[in-house]
């Protein structure tokens, strides 16, 4: 029988992964059921190189959430507890189209905004940085009042030792 030359015969299936150390945190254990569902759906959207380009809209997630209210309440809970962060706020683009807000998972590093395909006509972009912030380990999001405070908070958090996590 000839030896394999490193090619796979079958493609492996994609999966939605949340690291075990994230699930073991007290913040994850305190999440509502709809927030856990939304977090799994965001992990499903995350393909490894698009963190910061994840969307939460009812038109995309309507088969999972029956109402806007439940979905946006789950989004707010994930933000307050530090599992997601805003990468860009929604609104109008340069050519007048509606754009959805973009989100990033805080346990993974944020990918380059320039390379993300949904942002060709984006008016606002919050540079949240590339390093993972892992706010959920500390018990919640710091909730700065403006972009300048957000950047300062991010720089301070990345320097702290408790932001770095140990991968299993």
Model-derived regions: residue spans:
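Append "and, occasionally, other polyanion-binding protein interfaces
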Residues: 17, 58, 67-70, 74-79, ...
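Winged helix-turn-helix DNA-binding recognition segment
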Residues: 45-109
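A general marker of short, structured functional hotspots
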Residues: 11, 24, 35, 42, ...
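Charged low-complexity intrinsically disordered patches
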Residues: 1-10, 109-168
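Short recognition helix of helix-turn-helix/winged-helix DNA-binding domains
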Residues: 1-59, 63, 98, 110, ...
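Bulky hydrophobic/aromatic packing residues
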Residues: 28, 63-65, 88, 131-139
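A generic structural signal for solvent-exposed, polar alpha-helical segments
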Residues: 21, 27, 34, 45, ...
């Amino acid at each position: 029988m000839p030896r394999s030359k490193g090619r796979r015969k079958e493609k492996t299936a994609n999966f939605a992964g949340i690291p075990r150390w994230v699930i073991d945190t007290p913040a994850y254990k305190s999440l509502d059921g709809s927030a856990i569902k939304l977090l799994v759906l965001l992990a499903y959207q995350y393909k490894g190189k698009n963190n910061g380009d994840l969307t939460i809209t009812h038109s995309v997630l309507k088969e999972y959430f029956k109402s806007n209210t439940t979905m946006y309440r789950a989004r707010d809970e994930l933000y307050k507890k530090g599992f997601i962060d805003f990468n860009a706020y929604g609104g109008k683009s340069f050519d007048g189209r509606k754009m959805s807000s973009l989100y990033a998972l805080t346990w993974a590093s944020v990918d380059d905004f320039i390379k993300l395909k949904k942002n060709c006509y984006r008016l606002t972009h919050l540079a949240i940085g590339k390093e993972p912030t892992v706010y959920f380990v500390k018990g919640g999001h710091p909730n700065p009042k403006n972009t300048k405070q957000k950047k300062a908070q991010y720089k301070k958090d990345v320097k702290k030792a408790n932001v770095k996590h140990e991968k299993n």
